[in-house]
Design a protein with these regions (language model features):
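N-terminal strand-loop element at the rim of the active site
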Residues: 5-68, 155, 229-230
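A conserved mid-protein helix/loop that constitutes part of the nucleotide-sugar donor-binding site
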Residues: 13-24, 192-215, 229-236, 280, ...
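Short hydrophobic beta-strand element within catalytic cores of glycosyltransferases
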Residues: 37, 288-291
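Acidic anion/phosphate-binding donor-loop and adjacent secondary structure
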Residues: 64-68, 149-153, 159-161, 166-184
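Short His-centered aromatic/hydrophobic patch
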Residues: 87-95, 113
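Aromatic "clamp/platform" in nucleotide-sugar-dependent glycosyltransferases that forms part
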Residues: 252, 271
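Conserved acidic donor-binding segment of nucleotide-sugar-dependent glycosyltransferases
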Residues: 291, 303-313, 322-327
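A short, well-ordered alpha-helix in the C-terminal region of glycosyltransferases
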Residues: 328-342, 351-354
Length: 362
């Protein structure tokens, strides 16, 4: 098969991280696979994919909002005559749907929905637009039951075009990584390291994690990995509350497996989440995960890690403190490690390939 994945960018994020594992696996099975991005701004995963032999095509505009993206997509599709065109994230979904109107060949168009919520769903006008956009895809994949349910309710549709395929990761990459010495991150070896890996976005709620630090002893240190528009807001909060000596901002990093191995606890405290691939990565690293009890994320963590209220930083702090109990820490860590084994990239990628093959036979 000839497969084109189109994604808004390759910034730090769950959908982007999935592609760094999914695409090389598909190529290893003998398929012709390329990735097209609308913008290479902050494309932390671009080099990783290129190093693994994946060709990355950047839209001519190098902008996620340019109308010319339609023609960049059409030109790439016709140039390689793809069998499958697979769009990820909203801007890629929109431009790909419009590009399809100019495509005169009956190839298959697939999209994956990666989140349970977004700002578009606050607008009745956007519902009509989204209905049109999603009507152009032969198959709509969701990364969890919660993601599919929320999308079906939004589109007011429930038909056989919907399918669920959970995200997956390379388990061994995280299991076998070597941790850093904490002092390499500017933290004392006997300090308790709480880590959050995510872009700084309102939905990810780094501010709530910083607030939880106010309820924790001074030996607890917080490390944020990622960047984004709201990073300065979190820094200002930490400065105002005299927390800067206890918080490290590492920015964008490519050594996520080693960083997760270095943490004592990993937190994912989102207001909403389609799946929670970072939680799975932390679990595969053998770390206990504390997450907000929201759809998508709770499905991954429940029964293994600890779930807390998404808007209660004091409850988050209590969850962190509960892991001072060595027996509980060991129990939660082991459960998390076992849970991660359900979500392998091999299982995920094979499910996508089987989906493509079924669609091409239709």
């Amino acid at each position: 098969m000839k497969i084109l994945h189109i994604i808004t960018s390759l910034e730090l994020g769950g959908a982007e991280r999935l592609l760094t594992e999914l695409v090389p696996y598909q190529k290893s099975k003998g398929h012709f696979v390329k990735v097209m991005i609308l913008s290479d701004r902050g494309a932390v995963f671009k080099k990783e994919l290129e190093d693994r032999g994946i060709e990355i095509v950047v839209a001519k505009s190098n902008s996620i909002k340019s109308f010319s993206n339609i023609f960049s997509i059409v030109n790439e599709i016709k140039k390689e005559n793809y069998d499958i065109v697979h769009a990820h994230l909203v801007h890629a979904q929109y431009w790909t749907r419009l590009a399809k109107l100019l495509d005169d060949k009956k190839r298959k168009y697939i999209t994956t929905e990666h989140s349970t919520s977004n700002r578009r769903r606050d607008s009745k006008l956007m519902r009509g637009i989204d209905k049109f956009i999603f009507s152009g895809f032969d198959k709509i994949v969701s990364i969890s039951e919660a993601t599919q349910k929320s999308l079906q309710e939004w589109l007011e549709r429930d038909d056989n075009s919907f399918e669920i395929i959970y995200n997956g990761i390379d388990i061994k990459e995280f299991q076998l990584s070597e941790p850093y010495d904490k002092n390499e991150l500017g933290i004392k070896e006997d300090d308790y390291l709480v880590m959050m890996v995510s872009r700084f976005h309102q939905s990810k709620n780094q501010l709530g994690v910083a607030e939880a630090l106010m309820w924790l002893p001074v030996k607890y240190k917080l490390v944020f990995v990622g960047d984004g528009k709201l990073e300065d807001d979190v820094k200002k909060y930490c400065q105002k509350n005299n927390l800067m000596s206890r918080v490290k901002f590492l920015g964008m990093r490519k050594d996520i497996p080693r960083l997760l191995k270095t943490a004592d606890i990993v937190v994912q405290y989102s207001f909403f989440e389609g799946f929670g691939i970072t939680a799975i990565e932390a679990m595969a690293s053998g770390k206990p995960v504390i997450a907000s009890n929201v759809p998508g994320l709770s499905q991954v963590v429940e029964g293994a890690g600890i779930l807390v209220g998404a808007k209660d930083s004091k409850e988050l702090a209590k969850g962190i403190l509960s892991l001072r109990n060595e027996e509980l820490y060991k129990e939660i860590s082991e459960k998390c490690l076992e849970r991660s084994k359900k979500y392998t990239i091999k299982w995920c990628a094979n499910n996508y390939l089987e989906l493509y093959e079924r669609e091409l036979k239709c």
